Amino acid sequence: MVDHSRRQLGLAALSLPLLAATPHLRAQTGPIRIGSTLGLTGPLSGASAAQKIASDIFMEGLNKRGGLLGRPVEWIVRDDQSKPDVARTLYEQLITVDKVDLLMGPYATGSILSAMGVAQRYNKVLIHNTFGLPGLAKYDGQFSVSGSAFDIESVWPSLVMDAAASAARPPKTIAVLASKFPSVHFVTQGARQVIKSRGLSEAIYLEWDFGNRDFGAIAARVKDAKPDMVWVGGVGLEANMLLDAMRKIGYTPPMTFAMFPAPGPMAKSPDGQGVMALTVFEEHAPFTNNPVAAEFIKVYGERASKAGMAETSVDLFASVAFASWQVLEAAVTGTKGLDDKALGAWIKRSQVDTIIGRMRWDGMNNFIKGKDLYKVKQVNNGKWQVVWPPEFAAPGARVLGG
């Protein structure tokens, strides 16, 4: 009896280490949890919706491929209501309450800056894709996958003015208009300097508060200035509302550039023909030569149509979201782990091929050094197509207007 009891105690003792290890084993085989926010409601909901569809598609494909490190991946996304202060609170909760393993950045400059502060406090890597104030990205653990250079205030306006100069009638006078939305306002101030440095004339400069919906007075003043080209440093539907106000007074600019318009509404607008904008990806060669991109385009179109999206084509916002996940997957695979310090070091020294091109972080504040991945696209017969630089232009496409 005594021997039997001792044998049972011995077996129990042997089992204790196994029982103690069970939670750890479960943690190592359970899902990897990645947390982020998007502005699913509020003024930035359109672009955020595109990013959510793109992210959902990537997640499904990733888990079909076996996930990360042989474990399934769970994406926890919260609605930050397009408000930076809400994003800050939610990222804090994702780390401290949800106990996520990794972070992914939100949409838009303000929310990214808020998330960046939280990530720095907890030493978490933050990959993001729509941060328009590179000089404020001081945290070394943040990495931009927007495809942009550090000095976008000169690189982007130079790209746009190169495109405009290739038109049949290059502009000599430019009306410069700017929303006070931080990133586009910042780039527009750089555009004013680029315009001046090229010996061109600024016909008029006007700005408005983000959220403004009455563009009648601005439209009238632009019409009176008679510029060869209008630069619209705006986001979302601002350019649509401005062009609509111009049409109502019988005015159409000879050439228009709108920095980041809502792509679907602009392409389908009666005022959209010939409008130029920035992009890193459009649904034509050479972008579609990438088989991963081609499959993404197919699935995205189906999902966007089902969701009732105004634009069902893969564009800038959807493509950079997908590319961001490609970078995170590459980093986890490359380091064979989830340690944020190791992930950051790997990203910093590496280059990653994505659907928008080869990403690198050799510039200031972990942006691209020198020429970046941005192109100029233009609406032609209701469709966006890249027109500049020529090597990325759609077959037969050239800059219209002027």
Cite the ranges covered by each PLM segment:
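Segments of small-molecule ligand-sensing domains
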Residues: E302-A318, V327-V386, G402
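Hydrophobic alpha-helical
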Residues: T109-Q120, A220, P227-I249, A321
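Beta-alpha junction/loop-to-helix N-cap segments that form part of ligand/metal-binding clefts
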Residues: R33, G46-I53, G66-A137, W208-F215, ...
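N-terminal secretory signal peptides and thylakoid transit peptides that target proteins
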Residues: M1-A20
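Extracellular/periplasmic periplasmic-binding protein-like sensory domains
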Residues: M246-F322, V387-P395, L400
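Extracytoplasmic "Venus flytrap"
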Residues: G35-S55, R78-P84, Y107-A108, L177-F186, ...
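C-terminal segment of N-terminal export signals and the immediately downstream linker at the start
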Residues: A21-L38
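Extracytoplasmic ligand/sensor domains, especially the bilobed periplasmic-binding protein
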Residues: V100-Y205, P254-A277
